[in-house]
Every structure is written in structure tokens, then in C-alpha cells.
């Protein structure tokens, strides 16, 4: 939508000729502008997007042009379908941006055109009422146009005002009736009051529910119109045109409120040329999430849905996580020969972390659909998504059923299906499947020139879990040779996997040969990384096996005092302050130059109520500041002193 608006703004600023050529698009822009201005909840959501400033600047730039645009439209006598198409397109782009999966309410394209017929007296199919109204009375035109635009802007997120309810409407109708009964009024005054009364309905949240009630507002308005027809000599066509417009609005308000019975009843009272078509009725059932009524309607009416409609059905069922209905629809689509888009499966399972109920059934139905025609790479992506969910939930039986349909490992390497190969490596780690492990082990080296980085780490994790030392070292050497200059995080990952998955003798030998290439540049930060993974023992194992000189290790911690402080804080929290103190003693950390580390230990020791740790902190302070014990009231660590006195 923003691209469309940007295109309009650039063209409008560059040449005035564009305004003549592209009035429909310009009108669409101004209509879209009005849509967002009047719907505060929607504009709030839209303006939170990254490009909100761009849209706001466009709104400001053309805020004064909407009147000019409407004036241009009045003089625009070309095909209204072009205008309708542009308006519909930009409106639906708004909906798509706000509801990426399932727009609950969309004004159907037929409604756009029907409403425009009532606002454009230059149309060849023009009716007598609009021509009479718009050719003579500008005030009435504004009222009706305002009402029409409010219908065009309907959306489920719009929190419509409830300040004008049925009592106010009834009072307005009574005024209207008394005015018409006074024979002194003319046609213009009568129509103006009627239209202003109708305009109040847009504020009434119970509009559709009170419509068919006896002596409800519609019947009062209808009675009023009949009275006006007699007293002001309005012809029957004018009255029928007005009644048709009113029924159109009732129908779509009912649909907006999810009241299908009222919607269909109002629709049945409309002329066949304006009433919903069979396909539009199917759209209504979909919009109301009435899946079984939708299926029944399609079968009874023998409808062949468009590709766009099929897309909407799939997105609706996927976003609702309705696996049972989705399976039925997939099989139904296959039997009818309707196309199925794989992208919906991929996008849905990538965006939803929790697996849907009966997902194996959905996958089986999916395989049933694509058994004769599918893209192997796309199929692997979908299989990877399903398999990863099954692994997450430890559903081994479902994994085995899915693996029956997976291509051979060698073919997956040839097709570069690393999304699925990554998940298969994880499957081996979780379920210790020796057969799949052997197939991956036999094939990866033949295709290692194309292997991505994330798959290398999956291989390393798999080799470590299966205790395949030589395979692990081969993959590690290949990765080091390929990357040459490893970043810090890659060094941490490789060291941790190496210490976890390979026996100490081979690790020590590997460090002796290639250790300098994977050595962490920041040793305290590496310790923090290991602690984050709950693998502190492997960090200590690294110091023992790496062959680093003790003086070098001490210098690393001295030169990275901030990271050392962070490490001591994590150690105190996870392992206790006594462990942190022992660690400081091992590395001979110079507390003389940095009492922030003591602060960290003191803080956690107080929370632990650990007097041994508090005493150690006090002893260190005594050593750092001689004479501190003689002046405890001015101590650097007052909390520590209080706890020791207790």
C-alpha cells in the first residue's frame, strides 16, 4: 500500500498531467487517507509500523487535497469500474497489512460499485433519486456521501461510538414525522431531514439487531417515506431507489456484526442484480467462519471457486488451527481438482511455535494432495517444519511415519535440502537413530563444498552425541579451513562442542595441532558463555586441556576486569559465593586494583546469609585498606560489617 501511495505522491509532484490521467488512483489515495483518519484504533496500529512516518508525511502533504479530489471526481465521466477497481485494490491492501492471515470483514467488490452508483449521477445506469438529489441539493449530497464512506470504512477493529442509541434515533424520527405532517414543508426540507436521520444510524451499535423488530427504526423510516411520497409527490421509483440503498446498508451492517440470518434476509429483499451472487454468499460463510455451511453451499450450488477464494479458505483454516476442517478441505480440493499452494503450509508452521492438534493428519492430507505433482525442494521444507515440531514434542511414532516419505539422504544432499538435513541431524541427537546417522556420515564429505555453516554445527553436535570422534574432528577441521578467521562466537561454539563430544586424549592432541585457530580471544567471556549454557565444567576442562600457560590465563582475567566481574556475578548466583571465591583464588585475581568484584561477592553473600563469604570479603578489605577495622562506622562495606557483628 505504501508503495502505491509513494508512487502517487512522486507522480503528483512531478507532473500535473498525471492528475488528469490517474484520477481514479488519486481518488483511491484520498479515500484511503480518510479511512485511516476516521479509524483511530486502526491508524494507531498502522502508524506503529516502521514506515508510519512516511505514511504520515503523505497524509499531511495531501490533507488539503481531498476536496479538490472530490471535485475532480464529480467531473470525471470515464468508466466507474476503473475507479471501483482501484479503490477496492487499495482498501484490500490496507486489510492485508492489518490482518496478514485472516481479514474477518471485507467489503465485497459488488458493494463498492453499488454504492458508487448512488453517488455518481453521471453514470449511464443512474437512478432518478440520486439524479434529483445531487443535481439540486448539495447539503443532502454531503450527508449521503458521508454515510456511504462510513460503510466503505467498516472494519472489525473499529470501535464504533455508542453515544447515539435507539432513543435518540426515535426522537429524531418523531421530529421527522411531525415535520412531514406539516404541509408547509417542501421536498428539499423533507429529504434533508430524512437523510440526516439515516446518518444517525452509523453510531448505533445495535443497528442490525433492531432492524426487523416490529415498529423498529426501519419500519418508521419506511412509513415516513411513504408519507413523504404522498405529500411531496415523490414517484415510486425514487422511493424504491431509497429503499434499495437502505437495504444494502442493512445487509452489510448485519454481515459486519456476524448476523448471517439478518444479512441473508435483507439480501433476499434486494433486486437480483444487486443481491449477493452464489460466490459472494460463499465469501460470507468464509467470513463468518461457517466452514460446513460453506462446504454445503459450494456443493449444492455447484460452484467452482476462484484461486483467490481458495487461498482465503486455506489461510482462514490455517490461522484458526482447524486441522480437522483443513484436512477435509484439502481432500475436497484434491477431488475437485482445485490447486493447493504449498506456501501456506510453510508460512503457517514457521510463524506458529505450537504444533496444531492432529498435525500428522494434516501432513497426510498434504501428501495426498501433492502425490503426483510437487517441487522436491518445497516438499523438503514442509517436511522439515513438521518433523521439527514432532521432535520438539518427542513424538517418535509421528516422526517415523513422516520419515517414510522423506527422500534418500544422498538425494537431499544433491538437492541442497539443508533445512531438512538440519532437522534430521537433530533427530539423530534426540532419538539416537544409528541408521540415519550412518547415511549422513557417509554422504556429507562428498558434498562438503556446498554445506552451509549452520549445518556444520548440526553435524558437530550429532557426531559428539553419537561419540564419533573422527567424524567430529574431520568436520571441525573442514570448518576451520573454510572460514579461516573465525569470529568469537564460532570459537566458543566449536570449543564447547569439542569438549563435550570428544574424549580428552584426542581433544588435547587437537588443541596441540590446531588450538591457536579456535582459541577464545576473551577467556572470561568464554567462561560466561559456558555458564549460560550450564557447561562450566567444560570451561574448566578447556583450561586443563588447552595447554595454556597459567600466567597467560591470569593476564586474560586481569585485562578483562569487566568480564571477570560479570563472570563472578554469574558464578555467585549459580554456584554460590564460596565457589566464586575459590575461583578467584585459582586465577590469583588482583583484588587490590578492583574492589567491584568484592562488591559482587558481598551482595550475593548477604542474600545467601553466608558468613564465611562475608568474613572473606572483610578480610580482603582489611588487607587492601589497613586500619579499616579501627573505624568500622566509615567502612567501605557497611552491610558486611553489620552482618559480621550479628
From Swiss-Prot:
<dbReference type="GO" id="GO:0005739">
    <property type="term" value="C:mitochondrion"/>
</dbReference>
<protein>
    <recommendedName>
        <fullName>Cytochrome b translation regulator cbp8</fullName>
    </recommendedName>
</protein>
<comment type="subunit">
    <text>Component of a complex, at least composed of cbp7 and cbp8.</text>
</comment>
<comment type="function">
    <text>Translation factor for cob1/cytochrome b; plays a role in cob1 mRNA stabilization and required for correct folding of the protein.</text>
</comment>
<dbReference type="GO" id="GO:0070124">
    <property type="term" value="P:mitochondrial translational initiation"/>
</dbReference>
<keyword id="KW-0496">Mitochondrion</keyword>
<dbReference type="GO" id="GO:0008494">
    <property type="term" value="F:translation activator activity"/>
</dbReference>
<dbReference type="GO" id="GO:0045182">
    <property type="term" value="F:translation regulator activity"/>
</dbReference>
<keyword id="KW-0810">Translation regulation</keyword>
Amino acid at each position: 500500500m505504501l508503495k502505491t501511495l509513494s508512487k502517487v505522491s512522486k507522480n503528483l509532484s512531478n507532473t500535473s498531467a498525471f492528475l488528469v490521467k490517474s484520477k481514479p488512483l488519486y481518488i483511491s489515495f484520498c479515500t484511503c487517507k480518510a479511512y485511516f483518519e476516521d479509524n483511530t484504533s486502526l491508524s494507531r496500529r498502522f502508524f506503529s509500523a516502521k514506515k508510519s512516518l512516511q505514511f504520515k508525511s503523505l497524509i499531511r502533504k495531501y490533507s488539503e487535497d481531498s476536496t479538490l479530489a472530490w471535485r475532480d471526481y464529480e467531473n470525471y465521466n470515464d468508466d466507474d469500474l476503473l475507479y471501483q477497481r482501484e479503490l477496492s485494490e487499495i482498501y484490500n491492501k490496507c486489510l492485508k497489512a492489518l490482518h496478514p492471515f485472516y481479514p474477518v470483514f471485507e467489503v465485497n467488490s459488488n458493494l463498492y460499485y453499488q454504492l458508487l452508483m448512488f453517488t455518481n449521477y453521471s453514470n449511464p445506469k443512474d437512478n432518478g433519486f440520486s439524479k434529483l438529489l445531487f443535481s439540486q441539493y448539495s447539503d443532502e449530497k454531503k450527508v449521503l456521501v458521508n454515510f456511504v464512506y462510513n460503510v466503505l470504512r467498516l472494519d472489525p477493529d473499529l470501535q464504533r461510538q455508542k453515544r447515539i442509541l435507539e432513543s435518540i434515533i426515535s426522537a429524531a424520527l418523531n421530529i421527522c414525522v411531525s415535520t412531514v405532517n406539516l404541509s408547509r414543508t417542501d421536498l428539499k426540507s423533507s429529504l434533508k431531514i430524512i437523510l440526516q436521520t439515516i446518518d444517525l444510524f452509523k453510531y448505533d451499535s445495535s443497528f442490525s439487531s433492531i432492524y426487523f423488530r416490529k415498529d423498529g427504526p426501519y419500519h418508521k423510516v419506511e412509513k415516513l417515506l411513504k408519507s413523504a411520497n404522498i405529500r411531496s409527490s415523490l414517484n415510486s421509483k425514487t422511493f424504491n431507489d431509497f429503499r434499495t440503498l437502505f437495504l444494502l446498508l442493512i445487509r452489510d451492517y448485519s454481515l459486519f456484526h456476524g448476523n448471517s440470518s439478518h444479512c441473508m434476509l435483507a439480501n433476499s429483499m434486494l433486486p437480483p442484480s444487486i443481491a449477493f451472487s452464489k460466490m459472494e454468499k460463499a465469501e460470507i460463510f468464509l467470513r463468518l467462519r461457517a466452514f460446513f455451511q460453506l462446504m454445503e453451499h459450494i456443493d449444492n450450488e455447484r460452484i467452482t471457486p476462484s484461486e483467490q477464494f481458495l487461498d482465503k479458505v486455506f489461510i482462514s483454516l490455517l490461522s484458526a488451527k482447524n486441522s480437522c476442517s483443513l484436512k477435509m478441505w484439502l481432500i475436497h480440493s484434491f477431488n475437485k481438482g482445485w490447486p493447493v499452494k504449498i506456501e501456506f503450509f510453510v508460512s503457517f508452521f514457521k510463524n506458529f511455535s505450537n504444533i496444531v492438534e492432529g498435525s500428522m493428519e494434516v501432513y497426510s492430507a498434504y501428501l495426498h494432495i501433492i502425490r503426483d505433482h510437487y517441487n522436491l525442494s518445497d516438499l523438503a521444507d514442509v517436511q522439515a517444519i513438521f518433523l521439527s515440531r514432532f521432535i520438539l514434542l518427542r513424538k517418535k511414532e509421528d516422526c517415523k511415519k513422516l520419515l517414510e516419505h522423506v527422500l534418500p539422504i544422498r538425494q537431499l544432499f544433491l538437492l541442497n535440502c539443508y533445512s531438512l538435513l538440519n532437522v534430521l541431524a537433530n533427530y539423530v541427537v534426540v532419538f539416537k537413530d544409528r541408521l540415519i546417522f550412518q547415511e549422513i556420515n557417509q554422504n556429507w564429505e562428498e558434498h562438503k563444498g556446498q554445506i552451509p555453516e549452520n549445518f556444520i554445527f548440526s553435524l558437530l553436535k550429532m557426531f559428539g552425541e553419537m561419540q564419533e570422534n573422527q567424524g567430529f574432528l574431520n568436520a571441525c577441521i573442514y570448518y576451520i579451513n573454510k572460514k579461516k578467521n573465525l569470529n568469537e562466537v564460532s570459537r566458543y561454539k566449536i570449543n564447547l562442542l569439542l569438549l563435550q563430544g570428544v574424549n580428552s586424549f584426542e581433544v588435547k592432541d587437537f588443541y596441540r595441532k590446531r588450538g591457536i585457530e579456535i582459541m577464545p580471544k576473551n577467556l572470561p567471556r568464554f567462561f560466561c558463555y559456558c555458564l549460560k549454557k550450564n557447561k562450566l565444567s567444560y570451561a574448566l576442562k578447556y583450561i586443563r586441556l588447552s595447554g595454556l600457560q597459567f600466567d597467560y590465563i591470569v593476564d586474560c582475567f586481569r585485562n578483562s576486569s569487566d568480564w571477570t566481574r560479570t563472570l563472578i556475578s554469574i558464578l555467585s548466583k549459580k554456584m554460590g559465593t564460596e565457589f566464586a571465591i575459590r575461583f578467584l583464588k585459582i586465577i590469583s585475581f588482583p583484588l587490590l586494583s578492583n574492589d567491584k568484584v568484592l562488591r559482587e561477592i558481598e551482595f550475593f553473600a548477604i542474600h545467601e546469609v553466608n558468613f564465611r563469604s562475608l568474613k572473606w570479603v572483610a578480610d580482603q578489605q582489611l588487607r587492601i585498606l589497613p586500619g579499616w577495622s579501627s573505624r568500622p562506622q566509615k567502612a567501605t562495606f557497611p552491610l558486611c560489617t553489620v552482618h559480621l557483628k550479628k
